[in-house]
């Protein structure tokens, strides 16, 4: 019988630190955006690229919490209220982009063209689920928003987030993979 006290419980320290750093980065760049003038409350932002990078490196739990925390804090600080349907959509996006993290090999320095293709197919799928399904449906259910408005916002967010992640997220993934040494200073002390 194994000793249960020797088994690790909870999230690894690296994942917890990554969530904190990822959420802080997203909040720090939250206001860096280009308004999409013809669609209300929709902007071209870099948030999705950071959430995708954290999820792609550390997995779906890191993606989930980076998306949830960063959107919640960003809305509270910069907009005075939290739009929960979009917070949840960012969390779902974070989970989905994190599902292929083992295949991407970013942390091992093995992110190449094949992994970039997998990353981008997955992020387009994740963006579609988050912004064409989750956000608009929750906008209708939670806030009784008009369906034509929220689906136009969703399509715009899908296109903007997909494009930003395609360019910025892919560049960040390549860059992180190239500088990754395989060792980390984030080790548990004895």
Give residue ranges: language-model regions.
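Loop-helix junctions at membrane interfaces
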Residues: 1-190
